[in-house]
A protein has these predicted regions:
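Acyl-thioester-processing domains in fatty-acid/polyketide/NRPS systems
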Residues: 1-178
Length: 178
């Protein structure tokens, strides 16, 4: 990690589609993408590298454009972590050519804010949630198919949801297997 001219921490990497989290997360047309949860993991890892170990909250998260990696190519990316009054602001950027063979700059893929000082949530009563969530039960030991699979081609490591059910209102439960 380095720092930019404003003193913000910069975490950089070069990725290609051999990284399973990207190579096994493709559009139906075959384009490899960093999944949305990948941005969250990047933020968590950057905070850890920054020495932040407490609970945090991501606010005002905007996905502005996909971080796509063409087959057989690599893409430079960076995460900028800048201190703010509430915690940090972050931006994830990926390298982009202004025109083929032209100058390379960075485009903004996602941005958000990070806050601290959260009160830890109280423990969940999993038995009570399970008792309420009996509708729409679906299960498959090999992994349930996601509605997103109509548009995305996931590799086998993404099919982790084994069981799901819903309760009254906006409540549901799922069982995942890593």
């Amino acid at each position: 990690a380095t720092f930019d001219a404003a003193g913000a921490r910069l975490f950089t990497a070069t990725w290609d589609a051999r990284l399973w989290a990207i190579g096994e997360h493709r559009t139906a047309a075959g384009e490899a993408l960093l999944p949305g949860t990948g941005y969250l993991e990047l933020v968590a890892e950057a905070l850890k590298a920054q020495g932040e170990t407490g609970a945090f909250e991501i606010r005002d998260l905007y996905f502005l454009r996909p971080l796509a990696i063409p087959e057989g190519a690599a893409r430079d990316m960076r995460l900028r972590l800048a201190r703010s009054d509430a915690g940090y602001d972050f931006a994830v950027q990926s390298a982009a050519e202004a025109e083929p063979g032209g100058r390379v700059g960075f485009q903004l893929n996602a941005e958000g804010r990070i806050g601290f000082g959260l009160t830890p949530p109280r423990p969940l009563d999993l038995a009570a949630i399970e008792a309420r969530c009996r509708d729409g039960l679906r299960e498959d030991p090999a992994g349930l198919r996601s509605p997103q699979e109509a548009h995305l081609d996931f590799g086998p490591r993404w099919r982790v949801l084994r069981r799901e059910a819903y309760g009254p209102g906006p409540e549901g439960r799922g069982e995942v297997e890593p």
